[in-house]
Amino acid sequence: MNDSAMGSELDESPPLPDKVIAIHEALAEAKIPHAFGGALALAYYAEPRATIDIDVNVFAPVKRWREAIDALTQLGVATGDLDPTALERDGQCRLWWGNNAVDLFFAYDPIHEEMKKQARRVPFGDTTLTILAPEHLVVCKARFDRRKDWLDIEQMLIATDDLNLEAIEGWLTKMVGATDPRLTRLAELKSELAASE
């Protein structure tokens, strides 16, 4: 996603935790089911890491994108650089709220219905948020296939006792194919961790 839209001026928008709560409340008020992913969800399953991004899985088809965008625009999220054609093609977009990226991922695959069903309610400040289940967070991170994602996956494999590896492998196979190198990397990581116990 393009980072060029980020404002370089002093960010006078609310702090990140307040933005997360505001996004949650705005989408809930618009009756748009959603769950947070990324580093925010990771913090509930493994060692937290710093982030300035807000990843939101929107459990609605991409044709409802205007409803989600309208809800966020009212908060002060910048949507002027949004490319509707790319959003409809890719099922995702990056917006900016001050210096924080807000990444929206819309539903287009059967896994997204499972994500919605298995999302977990967690405490966040004085409220409660919905986050992705750990298995679905691992699948998302494996699909992105960045170095930091594999570090996060390793931490989750170590710290999350009840992680359903069979479900992770099943969904990843459906989404990327049985011969994809990401499945090999996941298997190697599991073996390395098992050998170190």
Residue ranges, per PLM feature:
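Compositionally biased terminal segments of proteins
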Residues: M1-E197
